[in-house]
Amino acid sequence: MDFKDSIKQLSERVFKLKENILTEEATKNAFIMPFINALGYDVFNPLEVVPEMTCDIAMKKGEKIDYAIMKDGEPVLLIECKHWAQDLNLHDNQLIRYFNVSKAKFGLLTNGIIYRF
């Protein structure tokens, strides 16, 4: 299956299941991990996808980004996830804080329906 077909299938799945997805963690498992997989990454390989990667921010130690896509041991894409019903406008600053202390070149804020790069 090519990328376009994978995304179409994921879109259909999201709209079919979303009312049954009650938590952020369930959103990550049902919607966002399949999206990462559709991008061609193995979500179960910690050399490619690191869940809950620590992004210490000045005085806030222990802050974690939901997923970091890795290349050669360095993050290239940070993904911050929210519950599918969350307004992403309320969380822009969180991803920006993580992005500013990382070597990653790209950041993604998503609720599994909307994907903001």
Regions found by a protein language model. Name each.
Residues 110-111:
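Charged, structured surface patches that assemble and position nucleic-acid processing machinery
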Residues 1-106, 117:
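A short, conserved, highly charged catalytic patch centered on acidic carboxylates
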